């Protein structure tokens, strides 16, 4: 957190990040607990949507978000290929159980375990330094070797998630709106296609290409993760390489930029693409409008739409506005990380009445 040179700063209760800034075990605990909150929300919302689902109304016209995602993954279909909600309750309950496990882990890291992993005794009772694996994940915000080591593990997990998705589509199958049925999809690892889809991914209409992109990302992320785990800073840590800029606030700002950018991309993708977001589950494509800010409106017949808007409209607009505010948070924290003191702004505004300009001869 930005201290503006104060060695002993005091933060308000609303500055939640200050509680975990230099306490790596609590930092992990907050991440795990946050994961539990997400899992609980996903599970509870899935069960709630399943309880109110009306088979006589198109799914996309019922304002649902969790069940359409499961349907796109090929979950909830009977042997005849019709969506009945089969196994959806299991998915929801599984997420709730996972949320309790995550919550317990978050409490353990926050309350029971050492506040800093650097003081952890590790998995072995002898306490030898080489056996204190948890200590390797201590937080040293201005140490690029420490940060690149932690970043590498994040990238590996992202890569594994991509592999899971690709293998799920290949073995189990996912919903293909072109044939309106579940089918197994083999990834198309054509690097030319993957490169070209950087610029027209919103119009992509082939599930094979979608899976190929995820397969490439899996390779790229795991390779990058291994690189970051195994390597250290090359040469002297100079100002050119970010010395003095790398900090907890800087890392927070980059994280906000990443999630904000992904949310905005998801908004545009969901609004127009019917291969990844089938009309059967999300409703008709949207039309982009401009008012005070950009927004999307429904284009189909809204008669009988339960919530007034399709699932696609809810997802696109909510993602866009969340992404927008995440990016504002990125700018705020990035500017603070660069050393700008926003208190000077409020001080300048407060002293406007007392400001005087003297003209000399």
Curated annotation (Swiss-Prot):
Subcellular location(s) per record: Cellular thylakoid membrane
Regions that span the bilayer: 27-47, 88-108, 149-169, 210-230, 250-270, 315-335
GO biological process: photosynthetic electron transport chain
Cofactor(s) needed by this chain: divinyl chlorophyll a; divinyl chlorophyll b
InterPro entries per record: PS_antenna-like, PS_II_antenna-like_sf
GO molecular function list: chlorophyll binding
Membrane topology: Multi-pass membrane protein
GO cellular component, one term: photosystem I
UniProt KW Endoplasmic reticulum keyword: no
Expression induction or repression: This transcript is strongly expressed between 4.5 and 72 umol blue light/m2/s. The whole antenna complex is most highly expressed under low light; as the light levels increase antenna complex levels decrease. Thus at least in this strain the amount of antenna complex is controlled mostly at a post-transcriptional level. Transcription decreases upon iron starvation.
Key words, A-Z: Chlorophyll, Chromophore, Membrane, Photosynthesis, Photosystem I, Photosystem II, Thylakoid, Transmembrane, Transmembrane helix
UniProt function note: The antenna complex functions as a light receptor, it captures and delivers excitation energy to photosystems II and I. The Prochlorales pcb genes are not related to higher plant LHCs.
Misc. remarks from the entry: This low-light-adapted strain contains 8 pcb genes.
Assembly and binders: The antenna complex consists of divinyl chlorophylls (a and b) and divinyl chlorophyll a/b binding proteins and binds more divinyl chlorophyll b than does the antenna complex from high-light-adapted Prochlorococcus.
Similarity comment text for this entry: Belongs to the PsbB/PsbC family. IsiA/Pcb subfamily.
Name this protein carries in UniProt: Divinyl chlorophyll a/b light-harvesting protein PcbE
């Amino acid at each position: 957190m930005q201290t503006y040179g104060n060695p002993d700063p005091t933060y308000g209760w609303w500055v939640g990040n200050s509680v975990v800034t230099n306490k790596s075990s609590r930092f992990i605990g907050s991440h795990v607990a946050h994961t539990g909150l997400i899992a609980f929300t996903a599970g509870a919302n899935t069960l709630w949507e399943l309880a109110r689902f009306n088979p006589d109304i198109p799914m996309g016209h019922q304002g649902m978000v969790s069940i359409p995602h499961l349907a796109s993954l090929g979950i909830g279909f009977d042997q005849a290929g019709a969506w009945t909600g089969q196994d959806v309750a299991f998915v929801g309950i599984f997420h709730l159980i996972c949320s309790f496990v995550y919550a317990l882990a978050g409490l353990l890291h926050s309350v029971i375990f050492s506040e800093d992993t650097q003081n952890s005794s590790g998995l072995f009772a002898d306490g030898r330094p080489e056996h204190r694996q948890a200590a390797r994940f201590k937080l040293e915000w201005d140490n690029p070797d420490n940060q690149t080591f932690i970043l590498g593990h994040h990238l590996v997990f992202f890569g594994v998630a991509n592999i899971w998705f690709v293998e799920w589509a290949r073995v189990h199958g996912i919903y293909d709106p072109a044939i309106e049925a579940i089918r197994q999809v083999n990834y198309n690892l054509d690097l030319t296609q993957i490169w070209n889809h950087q610029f027209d991914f919103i119009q992509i209409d082939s599930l094979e290409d979608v899976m190929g992109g995820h397969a490439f990302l899996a390779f790229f992320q795991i390779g990058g993760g291994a690189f970051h785990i195994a390597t250290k800073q090359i040469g002297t840590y100079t100002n050119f390489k970010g010395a003095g800029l790398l900090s907890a606030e800087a890392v927070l700002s980059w994280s906000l930029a990443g999630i904000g950018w992904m949310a905005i991309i998801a908004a545009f993708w969901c609004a127009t693409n019917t291969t990844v977001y089938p009309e059967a589950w999300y409703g008709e494509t949207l039309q982009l409008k401009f008012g005070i800010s950009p927004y999307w409106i429904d284009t189909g017949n809204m008669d009988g739409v339960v919530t007034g808007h399709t699932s696609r409209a809810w997802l696109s607009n909510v993602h866009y506005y969340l992404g927008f505010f995440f990016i504002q948070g990125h700018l705020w924290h990035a500017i603070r990380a660069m050393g700008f003191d926003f208190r000077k702004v409020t001080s300048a505004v407060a002293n406007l009445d007392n400001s005087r300009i003297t003209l000399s001869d």
